[in-house]
């Protein structure tokens, strides 16, 4: 589908899910309410709510959340009147039972997330979401780790299971603008014209906003972003920055920029115990193509064993570790320690 500058962009906020990684999943109920209220006032289309690793992500491996997914979802449901609540489910971490409970708590959109070459495992969850009448999204993580053509094959699988939107997910913040363009062209070549597409960018190479703009130019319908870029690694595409850029380009986004700017600086940024920015460590994520949520885990391991976080991240990239392999971070740290 060619670029249509007149279409309304769907703005999908991820501050209350991906943003959870930035503070080790420690949002309080009051934090969640304050952020949701501001986002709803700004009239974003959806607000994603869950542990950073999705429904039931709270665990020893991924980090325990301050509250349950359902407590967070219910808190948001009580604060919003415009936006819909989205949630994230990674098959193997979350189950159909968890999806049912999230729906009862107020979630009406689910993004079923798999590694970019493993769409097969999403079938049951996508089918159940459609049975519930949810807006059902296929979410292909670490999209830089396969070719555009292979990504399109996986996207087609998710579409065949019932997903009505397919996302290119740059979990490592490693895609260039040409990479994004190639992936959307490959998806558009095989997906049904009625199937919408989305872009989930990370800012590890400072390309989060640029990649989101390129995606829209290639016909992308939905853009993920977060207040102050709150997210794993160097964060997601900063929502207020993307909206300002979209506004200058004359695109219809339907949100209030100044409300988003205030929320980013007054509510979200003060919560960051580690600045969400491009620095030595987060740049290494994008450069090495590493899953962005490995950052905080790697920093803990580096501090414990007296080695550099960057060295751990680069080695994880060499080993092509993917989301869900957080347990390997300590193994890598110990290997590096033994080689020192």
Swiss-Prot record:
Site for Transition state stabilizer, residues: 17
Name of the protein: 4-hydroxy-2-oxovalerate aldolase
Keyword Disulfide bond applies: no
InterPro entries registered for this protein in UniProt: 2-IPM_HCS-like, 4OH_2_O-val_aldolase, Aldolase_TIM, DmpG_comm, DRE_TIM_HOA, PYR_CT
Pfam families linked to this entry: DmpG_comm, HMGL-like
UniProt keyword Manganese present: yes
Enzyme Commission number(s) from the entry: 4.1.3.39
Domain of life: Bacteria
Catalytic activity: (S)-4-hydroxy-2-oxopentanoate = acetaldehyde + pyruvate
GO biological process, one term: L-leucine biosynthetic process
Catalytic center residues: 21 (proton acceptor)
Keywords: Aromatic hydrocarbons catabolism, Lyase, Manganese, Metal-binding
Any one GO MF annotation of this record: manganese ion binding
NCBIfam families, A to Z: 4OH_2_O_val_ald (TIGR03217), PRK08195.1 (NF006049)
Residues that coordinate or bind substrate: 17-18, 171, 200, 291
Class in the EC hierarchy, top level: lyase
Family named by the database record: Belongs to the 4-hydroxy-2-oxovalerate aldolase family.
Binding site for Mn(2+): 18, 200, 202
The Pyruvate carboxyltransferase domain, residue ranges: 9-261
Organism, scientific name: Cupriavidus pinatubonensis (strain JMP 134 / LMG 1197) (Cupriavidus necator (strain JMP 134))
